[in-house]
């Protein structure tokens, strides 16, 4: 996996959800709750080595999680 700066991942995540920072915050929070409850990651990142927030942001940046998919998983 290519190492990317957090700023570029957040920028891509924002772009994927229409540049709505409030929505990004809520989406990251909801996904972190899922990951903390045992949900499998959708990206190749080990939750024991990476922060759950970083994993959630990468999933959103890569388009693997969006508001519709987060609702389905809750």
From Swiss-Prot:
List the catalysed reactions.
RNA(n) + a ribonucleoside 5'-triphosphate = RNA(n+1) + diphosphate
Q: What do the Gene Ontology cellular component annotations say?
A: DNA-directed RNA polymerase complex
- Print the keywords alphabetically: DNA-directed RNA polymerase, Nucleotidyltransferase, Transcription, Transferase
Q: Known NCBIfam families for this protein? A: PRK00392.6-2, rpoZ
- Family assignment? Belongs to the RNA polymerase subunit omega family.
Oligomer status and interactors: The RNAP catalytic core consists of 2 alpha, 1 beta/beta' and 1 omega subunit. When a sigma factor is associated with the core the holoenzyme is formed, which can initiate transcription.
Q: What does this protein do?
A: Promotes RNA polymerase assembly. Latches the N- and C-terminal regions of the beta' subunit thereby facilitating its interaction with the beta and alpha subunits.
Q: What is this protein called?
A: DNA-directed RNA polymerase subunit omega
Gene name of this polypeptide = rpoZ
């Amino acid at each position: 996996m290519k190492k990317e700066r957090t700023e570029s991942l957040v920028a891509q995540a924002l772009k994927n959800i229409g540049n709505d920072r409030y929505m990004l915050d809520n989406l990251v929070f909801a996904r972190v709750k899922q990951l903390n409850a045992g949900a499998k990651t959708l990206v190749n990142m080990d939750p024991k080595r990476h922060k759950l927030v970083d994993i959630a942001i990468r999933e959103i940046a890569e388009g693997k999680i969006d508001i519709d998919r987060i609702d389905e998983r809750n």
